[in-house]
Amino acid sequence: VSDRDGIKADTVGGTGKAILAQAFPSWSTASFDETYFLTCLLHDIGTTDKNIHATLMSFEFYGGLIVLDVLKSLGAPIEQAENVAEAVIRHQDLGDVGTITRIGALIQLATIFDNMGENADLVAKETIEDVVKAYPRKKWSACFAATIRRENGLKPWAHTTHLGEEDFPEGVKGNKLMAPWDDTQ
């Protein structure tokens, strides 16, 4: 995992843990927390330079396949490997119709919070400050907006286009909630 992806894993992990504690404390078990940690660590693996060019598939789908193979090869329980892979595949599959696993729901909430500033009421300002102090954003919004545009340029059919070919990268780049901390190093 690159430094850039590590930053994202840490910020999504930190804000996701806060959302879990505030909104869904009954979900937290040792197994759930470990599976969520793996999901945070690996959810953007499909966006690395190597992986984004390795396939015609959208980064979420290719990333899910990579994650499934890696976790199985490392001896993870199949249920955990499949749960993480499904969450990686669906972490940007936003909508208000249908169902999703708890891990999938939490990674969606945390990534849309971190990338777009959505659902700002789920995480206290002090918690955001603690997370970005421990894990500086290092201009994450501009970086990820560029990654979305790069994938959409390479793959005009990419799954992220369902969030708006221009609306999504512009929303990430213009994330007002995280703007005060986006330049932290």
Where are the model-predicted features located?
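Active-site flanking loop/helix segments enriched in acidic
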Residues: 1-9, 46-51
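Divalent metal-dependent phosphate-bond-processing catalytic cores, especially two-metal-ion Mg2+/Mn2+ enzymes
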Residues: 3, 10, 14-30, 76, ...
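An active-site-proximal "capping" alpha-helix that borders the catalytic cofactor pocket
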Residues: 12-13, 58-74
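His-Asp-centered metal-binding catalytic motifs of divalent-metal-dependent phosphohydrolases/nucleases
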Residues: 31-53, 59, 63, 67, ...
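Short leucine-rich amphipathic alpha-helices used at interfaces
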Residues: 51, 58-59, 102, 108
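Short acidic, glycine/proline-enriched loop segments that cap or flank alpha-helices
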Residues: 54, 75-76
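Membrane-interface starts of transmembrane alpha-helices
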Residues: 77, 81-82
